[in-house]
Every structure is written in structure tokens, then in C-alpha cells.
Regions:
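Two-component histidine phosphotransfer core
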Residues: 1-196, 202-206
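C-terminal end segment of the histidine kinase catalytic
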Residues: 195-221
């Protein structure tokens, strides 16, 4: 059994695509786009390359808030290109939060939920607002709100089950569960999450992290 597992692991490693191959291929396509004056395509390729470089490194890494914001901007830019006039977004981050630290890609599943689920029943007019400000001296207040379809009380209760009884989580809530699971692992009882949602009005998720780390160096480097 151990030998079969070892062979399977080797096969899996052999099947993986080297990230440098992807980066080099994207760069090649980008140069072709520029040679043909396809500036929009070049911009999209640049954003996609940045997303890939950011996401393939250690997901448990601590980064500066400003790096996480830049990643979210690129992600939302590509989603806007994909969905056209579906939504607009606004990010309000207090300047003094830029050099506070957060675990990378912690917010992405919540932003993705707003795009893919919150706006599932509309074709235009969606709005996403992300607010980041201090909570105490080193803590963070993070708010992700949308004006999408919203959720009923039963669905909200199901999400809170992920918080208080993670062993009972539903596979349909895997994105939210992953956020909660990581918050528990990184911050323990130093965080709080609130869900405010109403059918036809939208959803607001608030995360408050107390006593976060402050840094003046980008630890993603």
C-alpha cells in the first residue's frame, strides 16, 4: 500500500505543470498581443500573471494589507472583463492599514461569493463595497458588502454552523468554510465574523481581527 501511494504521489508530481512554464507562456502571449497593438488583452494577461504568481506561493504566508488589496483589485478587474456590466466595486481602506498584516487570499472567497452567487440573478447594476479600517491599535475591521440577491435566515444559520460547528459544514459552503477554517487556525478567539443579509437587498460580511501584526516590510517578498 505504501509503495502504491508513493507511485501515485510521483505520478501526481509528474503531472503538475511547472509554474514557470505558465508564466513564460503568458509572457509570450503578451508580447504577441503588444505586437498586434492589443493593449486590452495585454493588460488582462498582465493581471492574470500577477494573480498566478501571488496565488501559487505559500497560502499561509502573511502579507501586507496593501498587497492583498492589489490582488483583489486585479481579481475584480478580470471578473469585470468576464461579466461586462454586471457590477462595479469600491475599496475604501484607511491608509494606516496598508502596513498591517493579513494572511494572503483570506478575503478572496468572500469577494468571489459576491460576484458568482450574490449577482447570479442579475445582468447589471451590481455593487461590491470593501471597507478596511483599524480595529484598535493593530487590529483590522474588514467589511465586504454587495447589493445582490441576499440570503434567507436558513442560509445564514447554515453559514454560522461553519463558524460554531465546523465539523457539520455543507460542501455547498466550502468557500465560506475555508475562510472560517483559516481564521480559526490563524487567529483563534481573536477574531469575530458577522453576517447580515436580506433577500433582495444584499449581503454584508464583517470580520474583526484583534491584535494583528504590524509590519513595514512586505513579507510576500
Amino acid at each position: 500500500e505504501m509503495e502504491l501511494r508513493r507511485i501515485a504521489e510521483i505520478k501526481t508530481l509528474e503531472a503538475q505543470i511547472n509554474p514557470h512554464f505558465l508564466y513564460n507562456t503568458l509572457d509570450t502571449i503578451n508580447w504577441i498581443a503588444l505586437e498586434n497593438n492589443e493593449l486590452e488583452i495585454s493588460e488582462m494577461l498582465g493581471a492574470l500573471g500577477s494573480l498566478l504568481r501571488y496565488s501559487v506561493t505559500n497560502i499561509d504566508m502573511v502579507v501586507l494589507v496593501k498587497a492583498e488589496i492589489e490582488w483583489i483589485k486585479k481579481y475584480l478587474y478580470l471578473q469585470q472583463k468576464r461579466f461586462g456590466d454586471l457590477f462595479q466595486y469600491e475599496i475604501q481602506a484607511e491608509p494606516e492599514t496598508e502596513y498591517l498584516s493579513i494572511h494572503k487570499m483570506l478575503l478572496q472567497p468572500l469577494v468571489e461569493n459576491a460576484v458568482l452567487h450574490g449577482f447570479a440573478d442579475i445582468t447589471e447594476g451590481g455593487r461590491i463595497q470593501i471597507v478596511i479600517r483599524r480595529a484598535g491599535e493593530k487590529g483590522l475591521y474588514i467589511e465586504i458588502a454587495d447589493n445582490g440577491c441576499g440570503m434567507d435566515r436558513e442560509k445564514i444559520a447554515e453559514l454560522y454552523e461553519c463558524v460554531y460547528h465546523p465539523e457539520l459544514y455543507q460542501k455547498s459552503n466550502i468557500g465560506f468554510f475555508n475562510v472560517v477554517n483559516r481564521l480559526n487556525a490563524y487567529y483563534g478567539d481573536r477574531y469575530h465574523i458577522t453576517i447580515d443579509s436580506h433577500i433582495g437587498e444584499g449581503t454584508k460580511v464583517i470580520i474583526v481581527i484583534q491584535n494583528g501584526e504590524s509590519s513595514h516590510e512586505d513579507s510576500s517578498r
